């Protein structure tokens, strides 16, 4: 018997691990679709006129090869003790939180909790976060996180403008705010026509402004009471915003006690690594009468169908997916996973633990300041929490270098000062090394007093809710985290077929490096030579993304897709201004566009002109041509999504681009659907001038239950000089282009949430060029397979000229309304089958948009199809009068364990209700609550942890 070696490659990540269907399963699926090969399907789906000719050709790495490469790159970063401060601090991530939250796919693969019945665990964790923020800031309402502190400050400015009764058009910013915050505020204010006045609080003229931002503690350390300044603002009908620090508020008088209207800041130092800039969860809290103006998501308490307490996202009519250009913000992605980590940090330590950490940080700072003063150094300010500034004159460079030689980064302040910010990782050894850098060899004193006046000492309690008072044994913490995760449905349990969301595999090997200290401990403003590994990874990823998209330069700064849109539009406007065409402010946007598009355009100061859709779902070319002509030399841009939001490759995309360019506009191609294009179509080659990429969709960053995300923007060469810059960095921030960007920043850190860029880089490296292209092809196959399987039961709403969809398909459920069955009924019934619902009522009301991605196996897709076919039969029973819609399992869905064991008085069998076709019996997912009453929740708004008795007593 002769030996023949197998040709099976056990290390082929793309085809053996990432892509779901096997080659034999693909053949079966292709037969169902009605084609003989994947090549034929792509030819019938993607117009020949736009297909790219040059393939992506880099070789893939196996998982073990990737991790070796990552170790090599990580070794090029220098792990230092960074005492730079400026909003970023060393912290200790409790291993229990790292292991059970950050590294747990039950938490990091979940989607935004728009379906509350399957998100009760993370909604509770986010409610804990809101309670933590509300308690510490002394304001009654807090949201569930924003992108970063600087963005939160800009959001607070526009919120103050909306809510203030002052007629002024200026906003005052304390000069003691972090420099990156001031820069982001300026970027946001300019297109909105808001004047930004930067100065010291003594220079504030309240009558001249609609609001003011104070930093507490200040960026250079000053702690002062703003009560009088805030009262003066209120006299002038202006609002007060305080940028603050949660750890400092464990000791210091809270902003609410000073009369602040809004508080913002970052929760990074609550157990979240710096990560060279992120991701971290920013927070915002406000007075009760401002809650409807607050941006971002808000978790509230409601009841389910049985009257049991249930959590949900409240007041969603404020958000961009509903209000579009009239939304309070364009925020879509937040930082849910990082907010969850911060909330568990507070649960882990409790109020006494947090105060002990705050005291330790503060008293260490007092010891350091005292030792410096005793040695003759000039130290300021007189009142501080964790940050001091030392006047060093011409010796600045020498002291900074001496500190670096001892493994410590200090902050360069002006030409003659050095800033020092201590944190929870600071010990006596670190203090001794700092003193040594100043030539001081005497130890710091052991016994010291407060470093700020006693009237600034906090008098009120915080975190009194039982969740923050629980037994802090790790066994209890572990079980609490497990209980919450068991309430949720994430990718670790089932397919999440959300259209336009691309819930693909987030592979373990891609995730592992983000927790390594070589990546996690770097400060975003550390000297560049300490981050050589980061720069290599970011630069290589940027170049690969340029090859994928056909663009010439890539900015990695935007922290979300919506922020990428905003940055891209600002880039276009800056380009027009540089050409003397500042009057170009009109943006054409199809009516079917994602809600962030018009919201972003409005934020950029553009006038939105809506373009109709043709009956087949395409952009109405005649209407587009007319409106472009009407705009004429006022046309700034058009924003289109490709493939379209209807899930189709439109044949007319080149013509849309041509018309826009003919009238002097720029083409923004939204990259939300890039998962249908990688390796097949380059947006930069079909007429696009700028696109953002949702790395948390196409490039494998997990959704984290509602963030983090990343939205880098690619541009053609003529736009590269107008990409976002940053006040802390000189030289180019872009990949693929040598020209330095000098526009204002859109986020706090130069490279946004830099640490999670490693995930997308790892994905590109392991997939290889051919694997990325194959992933796109299989994503298109999976969507067409679902469309083919369901076509007889549901109408597939939009298809291309040859009857194909792209990577997603829209199922029309509107005809069922005549029988009283709603799209909500279908979505909730899918929960009984163990599935997250597809995207509901967008881009067409009353429809479901399904996107399976390339990562789902045929077996899982078939289970999903079986569930939808069974639901169709239940609808048919209603249509034919066998059962009323209100009595059907559709209306009573989802079914809970409480339903299963209760007396059964329903007009369908218990078996049908609780174990529908497609559901598991042994491993069945049981939602913890029944259908949530959204209207009740908005009428009875509670956005902090409810009293303990409500946990055992059903809501009245």
From Swiss-Prot:
Reported cofactor(s): pyridoxal 5'-phosphate
Superkingdom assignment: Bacteria
InterPro entries referenced in this protein's UniProt entry, alphabetically: GcvP, GDC-P_C, GDC-P_N, GDC_P, PyrdxlP-dep_Trfase, PyrdxlP-dep_Trfase_major, PyrdxlP-dep_Trfase_small
GO cellular component labels: cytosol; glycine cleavage complex
Catalytic activity: N(6)-[(R)-lipoyl]-L-lysyl-[glycine-cleavage complex H protein] + glycine + H(+) = N(6)-[(R)-S(8)-aminomethyldihydrolipoyl]-L-lysyl-[glycine-cleavage complex H protein] + CO2
E.C. numbers: 1.4.4.2
N6-(pyridoxal phosphate)lysine modifications at: 697
Any GO BP: glycine decarboxylation via glycine cleavage system
Molecular function via GO: glycine binding; glycine dehydrogenase (decarboxylating) activity; pyridoxal phosphate binding
Family per similarity comment: Belongs to the GcvP family.
Record's function text: The glycine cleavage system catalyzes the degradation of glycine. The P protein binds the alpha-amino group of glycine through its pyridoxal phosphate cofactor; CO(2) is released and the remaining methylamine moiety is then transferred to the lipoamide cofactor of the H protein.
NCBIfam families recorded: gcvP (TIGR00461), PRK04366.1 (NF003346)
Protein's name in the database: Glycine dehydrogenase (decarboxylating)
Gene that this sequence comes from: gcvP
């Amino acid at each position: 018997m002769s030996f023949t070696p197998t040709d099976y490659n056990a290390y082929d990540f793309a085809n053996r691990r990432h892509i779901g269907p096997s080659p034999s399963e693909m053949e079966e699926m292709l037969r169902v679709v009605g084609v003989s090969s994947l090549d034929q399907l792509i030819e019938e789906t993607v117009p020949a006129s736009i297909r790219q000719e040059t393939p992506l050709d880099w070789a893939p790495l196996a998982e073990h090869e990737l991790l070796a490469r990552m170790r090599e790159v990580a070794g090029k970063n220098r792990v230092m003790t960074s005492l730079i401060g400026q909003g970023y601090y060393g912290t200790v991530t409790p291993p229990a939180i790292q292991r059970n939250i950050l590294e747990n796919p039950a938490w990091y693969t979940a989607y935004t909790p728009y379906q509350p019945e399957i998100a009760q665990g993370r909604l509770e964790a986010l409610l804990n976060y809101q309670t933590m923020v509300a308690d510490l800031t002394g304001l009654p309402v807090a949201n569930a996180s924003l992108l970063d502190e600087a963005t939160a400050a800009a959001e607070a400015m526009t919120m103050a403008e909306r809510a203030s009764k002052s007629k002024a058009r200026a906003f005052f910013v304390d000069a003691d705010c972090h420099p990156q915050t001031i820069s982001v505020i300026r970027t946001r204010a300019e297109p909105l026509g808001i004047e930004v006045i930067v100065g010291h609080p003594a220079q504030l003229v309240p009558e001249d402004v609609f609001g003011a931002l104070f930093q507490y503690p200040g960026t250079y350390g000053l702690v002062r009471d703003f009560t009088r300044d805030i009262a003066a603002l209120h006299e002038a009908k202006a609002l007060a915003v305080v940028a603050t620090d949660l750890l400092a508020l464990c000791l210091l008088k809270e902003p609410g006690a000073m009369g602040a209207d809004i508080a913002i800041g970052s929760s990074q130092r609550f157990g979240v690594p710096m990560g060279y800039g992120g991701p971290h969860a920013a927070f915002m809290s406000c007075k009760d009468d401002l809650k409807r103006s607050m941006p971002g998501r808000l978790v509230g308490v409601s009841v389910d169908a049985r009257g049991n307490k249930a959590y949900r996202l409240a007041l969603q009519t404020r958000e961009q997916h509903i209000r579009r250009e009239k939304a309070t913000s364009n925020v879509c992605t937040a930082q849910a996973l990082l907010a969850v980590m911060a909330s568990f940090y507070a649960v882990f330590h409790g109020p006494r633990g947090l105060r002990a950490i705050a005291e330790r940080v503060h008293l260490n700072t007092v010891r350091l300041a005292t030792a410096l003063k005793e040695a003759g150094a000039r130290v300021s300010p007189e009142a501080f929490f964790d940050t001091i500034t030392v006047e060093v004159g011409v010796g600045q460079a020498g002291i900074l270098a001496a500190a670096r030689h001892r493994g410590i980064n200090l902050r360069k302040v002006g030409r003659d000062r050095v800033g020092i910010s201590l944190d929870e990782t600071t010990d006596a050894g670190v203090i001794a090394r700092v003193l040594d850098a100043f030539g001081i060899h005497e130890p710091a004193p052991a016994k010291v007093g407060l470093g700020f006046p006693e009237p600034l000492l906090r008098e009120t309690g915080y975190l009194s809710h039982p969740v923050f008072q629980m037994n802090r044994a790790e066994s209890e913490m572990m079980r609490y985290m497990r209980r919450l995760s068991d309430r949720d449905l994430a990718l670790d349990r089932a397919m999440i077929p959300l259209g336009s969301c691309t819930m693909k595999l987030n592979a373990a090997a891609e995730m592992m490096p983000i927790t390594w200290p070589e990546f996690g401990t770097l400060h975003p403003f550390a000297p560049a030579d300490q981050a050589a590994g980061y720069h290599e990874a970011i630069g290589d990823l940027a170049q690969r993304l340029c090859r994928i998209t056909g663009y010439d330069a890539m900015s990695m700064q935007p922290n979300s897709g919506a922020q990428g849109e905003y940055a891209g539009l600002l880039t276009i406007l800056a380009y027009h201004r540089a050409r003397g065409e500042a009057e170009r402010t009109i943006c054409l946007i199809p009516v079917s566009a994602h809600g962030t598009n018009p919201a972003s355009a409005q934020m950029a100061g553009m006038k939105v002109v809506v373009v109709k859709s043709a009956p087949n779902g395409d952009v109405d070319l005649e209407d587009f041509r007319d409106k472009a002509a009407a705009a004429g030399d006022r046309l700034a841009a058009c924003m289109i999504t490709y493939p379209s939001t209807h899930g189709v490759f439109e044949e007319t995309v080149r013509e849309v681009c041509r018309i826009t360019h003919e009238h002097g506009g720029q083409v923004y191609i939204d990259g939300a659907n890039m998962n249908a294009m990688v390796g097949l179509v380059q947006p930069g080659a079909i007429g696009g001038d700028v696109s953002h990429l949702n790395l948390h969709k196409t490039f494998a960053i997990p959704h984290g239950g509602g963030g983090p995300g990343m939205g880098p923007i690619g541009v053609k060469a003529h736009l590269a000089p107008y990409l976002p810059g940053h006040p802390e960095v000189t030289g180019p921030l872009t990949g693929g282009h040598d020209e330095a960007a000098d526009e204002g920043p859109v986020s706090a850190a130069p490279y946004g949430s830099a640490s999670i860029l490693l995930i997308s880089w790892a994905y590109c490296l392991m997939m290889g060029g051919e694997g990325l292209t194959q992933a796109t092809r299989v994503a298109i196959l999976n969507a067409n397979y679902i469309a083919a399987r369901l076509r007889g039961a549901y109408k597939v709403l939009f298809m291309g000229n040859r009857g194909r969809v792209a990577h997603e398909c829209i199922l029309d459920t509107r005809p069922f309304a005549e029988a009283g069955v709603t799209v909500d009924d279908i979505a909730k019934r899918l929960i009984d089958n163990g599935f997250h619902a597809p995207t509901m009522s967008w881009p067409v009301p009353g429809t479901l948009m399904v996107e399976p991605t390339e990562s789902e196996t045929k077996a899982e897709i078939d289970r999903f199809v079986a569930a939808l076919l069974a639901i169709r039969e239940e609808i048919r029973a209603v249509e034919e009068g066998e059962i009323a819609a209100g009595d059907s399992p559709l209306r009573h869905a989802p079914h809970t364990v409480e339903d299963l064991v209760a007396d059964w008085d329903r007009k369908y069998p218990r078996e049908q209700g609780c174990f529908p076709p497609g559901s598991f019996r042994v491993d069945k997912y049981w939602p913890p609550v029944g259908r949530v009453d959204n209207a009740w929740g908005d009428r009875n708004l509670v956005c902090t942890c409810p009293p303990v008795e409500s946990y055992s007593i059903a809501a009245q």
